């Protein structure tokens, strides 16, 4: 029990550590680190704290919570939003807190959605990741003023395989969900 409470404390402190100037500078050095590395780390921290803390879940809030999490995530993928995290420390703090909340909400409420809704959402979300990746990779103009065009292209080409991988995972889940096991037939 004591080790779980220590683990909770470490997970809760990790987003705070990301706001320290030296650690923040490491993630802000390149666009892939900021928009992909830090984002995934915050999503994982939110997911982990949701799994370690027993919260009461309300099924009626599941679709709203997943929608809110999606909109928050997509907001921080917009180039102007990424620029704001570089210019204003308060926007960076909001970025950290909101992506932590996105991980928490998705981990907490995703399992409560019906199977078909999870599949549809997963296919849509992974397609949006691929679309953002292609947008960043194919643009010959600078979308994010805080980073170089090369970093923007690198970030875009990292998002494309990530989105395609998530898409394949969702399809694998869908086939498992649609096809009944042989033993139960």
Q: Where are the regions a protein language model picked out?
A:
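Alpha-helical membrane segments of multi-pass proteins
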Residues: 1-185
């Amino acid at each position: 029990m004591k080790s779980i409470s220590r683990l909770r404390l470490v997970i809760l402190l990790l987003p705070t550590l990301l706001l320290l100037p030296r650690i923040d500078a490491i993630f802000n050095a390149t666009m892939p680190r900021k928009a992909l590395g830090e984002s995934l780390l915050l999503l994982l921290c939110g997911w982990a704290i949701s799994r370690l803390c027993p919260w009461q879940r309300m099924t009626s809030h599941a679709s709203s919570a997943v929608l809110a999490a999606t909109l928050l995530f997509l907001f921080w993928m917009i180039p102007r939003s990424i620029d704001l995290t570089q210019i204003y420390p308060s926007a960076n703090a909001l970025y950290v807190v909101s992506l932590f909340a996105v991980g928490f909400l998705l981990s907490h409420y995703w399992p409560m959605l019906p199977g078909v809704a999870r599949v549809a959402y997963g296919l849509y979300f992974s397609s949006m990741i691929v679309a953002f990746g292609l947008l960043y990779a194919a643009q010959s103009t600078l979308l994010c003023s805080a980073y170089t065009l090369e970093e923007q292209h690198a970030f875009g080409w990292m998002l494309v395989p990530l989105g395609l991988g998530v898409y394949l995972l969702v399809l694998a889940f869908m086939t498992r969900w649609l096809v009944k096991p042989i033993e139960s037939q």
